[in-house]
From Swiss-Prot:
It comes from Homo sapiens. InterPro entries: DCN-prot, DCN1-like_PONY, PONY_dom. GO terms for cellular component: cytoplasm; cytosol; nucleoplasm; nucleus; perinuclear region of cytoplasm; plasma membrane; ubiquitin ligase complex. The gene is DCUN1D3. Tends to be down-regulated in different type of cancers, including lung neuroendocrine carcinoma, thyroid Huerthle cell carcinoma and lung squamous cell carcinoma. Mostly expressed in testis and brain. Highly expressed in liver, bladder and renal normal tissue than their tumor tissue counterparts. Palmitoylation stabilizes DCUN1D3 at the cell membrane. This is DCN1-like protein 3. Its main location: membrane. PANTHER family: DCN1-LIKE PROTEIN 3, RP42 RELATED. Keywords: Cell membrane, Cytoplasm, Lipoprotein, Membrane, Myristate, Nucleus, Palmitate.
């Protein structure tokens, strides 16, 4: 920032003579006479004669030359800079309120206090949205960069400001492209990056699937989660490919699974799931049939 200071300079040359700023000759002096006064250029901003300079009156040219440029642009930039500086100070104070004593980051204990001040549960969907906007690399942790960049991304520098953004974040997450980005982020967010994990633990994956589909629960989700829960020995982890493809699965496969084809390029775990679910439904149907028919195949009304 800075102010532009200009100075008005009066022209030093005299007008009315071809000699310009040359020393006038004796012949010129004798012709003009001893009492002749050299014509002076009027100071900036004062009216003068009608002498033209490139088609403009000399007085007008001088006035235009000494006009100062408008400072509205500089003032606007200065005001914006001051506002940004104040916002950074508020963010610094907010970050320090929750950051760990030893590490320059908000860790589990600070995260609990942060969520408590936001009046949200650490395990609820709005916190996942916040982590998404902060592009947090690890659960239960916000680094300084993540916190500052995230707050700037949602234009908030206070607890009240963050709370005020939740409705718009919930609406944004309903957009198909935004939800896809959130969904893919959630897988990475669930990994333990410090351990170099490449797949989600089954229990973590189940919890995150329930969480990320909070606003849009596909019909097949409950069946899928039941399959994962009841087959713990056969499913050790969920790969990134399986996680990403499950979103496509929910969008193209109907709840009755009738349009699923093993010939398509689905993960093998989906083949196992569909086979397991169809067998479960068959057994369930047979059980209902047996109950309705009673002993020896007689209907209940025929047993009396």
């Amino acid at each position: 920032m800075g102010q532009c200071v200009t100075k008005c300079k009066n022209p030093s040359s005299t007008l009315g003579s071809k000699n310009g700023d040359r020393e006038p000759s004796n012949k010129s002096h004798s012709r003009r006479g001893a009492g002749h006064r050299e014509e002076q250029v009027p100071p900036c901003g004062k009216p003068g004669g009608d002498i033209l300079v490139n088609g403009t009156k000399k007085a007008e040219a001088a006035t235009e030359a000494c006009q100062l440029p408008t400072s509205s642009g500089d003032a606007g930039r200065e005001s914006k800079s001051n506002a940004e500086e104040s916002s950074l100070q508020r963010l610094e104070e907010l970050f320090r309120r929750y950051k760990d004593e030893r590490e320059d980051a908000i860790l589990e204990e600070g995260m609990e206090r942060f969520c408590n001040d936001l009046c949200v549960d650490p395990t609820e969907f709005r916190v996942l949205l916040l982590a998404w906007k902060f592009q947090a690399a690890t659960m239960c942790k916000f680094t300084r960069k993540e916190f500052f960049d995230g707050c700037k991304a949602i234009s908030a520098d206070s607890i009240d400001g963050i709370c005020a953004r939740f409705p718009s974040l919930l609406t944004e997450a309903k957009q198909e492209d935004k939800f896809k980005d959130l969904y893919r982020f959630t897988f990475q967010f669930g990994l333990d990056s410090e351990e170099g994990q490449r797949s989600l633990h089954r229990e973590i994956a189940i919890a995150l699937w329930k969480l990320v589909f909070t606003q849009n629960n596909p019909p097949v989700l409950d069946q899928w989660l039941n399959f994962l829960t009841e087959n713990p020995s056969g499913i050790k982890g969920i790969s990134r490919d399986t996680w990403n493809m499950f979103l496509n699965f929910t969008q193209v496969i109907g709840p009755d699974l009738s349009n699923y084809s093993e010939d398509e390029a689905w993960p093998s775990l989906f083949d196992t799931f569909v086979e397991w679910e169809m067998e479960r439904r068959k057994r369930e149907g047979e059980g209902r049939g047996a109950l309705s028919s009673g002993p020896e195949g007689l209907c209940p009304e025929e047993q009396t």
